[in-house]
Amino acid sequence: MAKQSMKARDVKRAKLAEKFFTKRVELKAVISDVNASDEERWNAVLKLQTLPRDSSPSRQRNRCRQTGRPHAFLRKFGLSRIKVREAAMRGEIPGLKKASW
């Protein structure tokens, strides 16, 4: 089980990333625009650096919805491998069954 503070930190990062998403996209568009002047591009870089660090989507961590486990996360289910296996064994995931050959 992950600490509550770690889960809360990820929730905070998700909210910040959502809040600054449009501003971040606009600044990155200016930075990658070849037709923009060097000064405009440099100012966009400086503005991007002033945004909160946690507003970057790459700072978010995928976590299991039930346990908060950060490793062995399966995106399709939103759970860790352990919880997916437990749910599959109980028959809670439609269409998923144990492999046998």
Swiss-Prot record:
PROSITE patterns: RIBOSOMAL_S14. GO terms for molecular function: rRNA binding; structural constituent of ribosome. The keyword Kinase does not apply. GO terms for cellular component: cytoplasm; small ribosomal subunit. Keywords: Ribonucleoprotein, Ribosomal protein, RNA-binding, rRNA-binding. InterPro entries: Ribosomal_uS14 (IPR001209), Ribosomal_uS14_bac/plastid (IPR023036), Ribosomal_uS14_CS (IPR018271). GO terms for biological process: translation. The keyword Ribosomal protein applies. Binds 16S rRNA, required for the assembly of 30S particles and may also be responsible for determining the conformation of the 16S rRNA at the A site. NCBIfam families: PRK08881.1. Belongs to the universal ribosomal protein uS14 family. Part of the 30S ribosomal subunit. Contacts proteins S3 and S10. This is Small ribosomal subunit protein uS14.
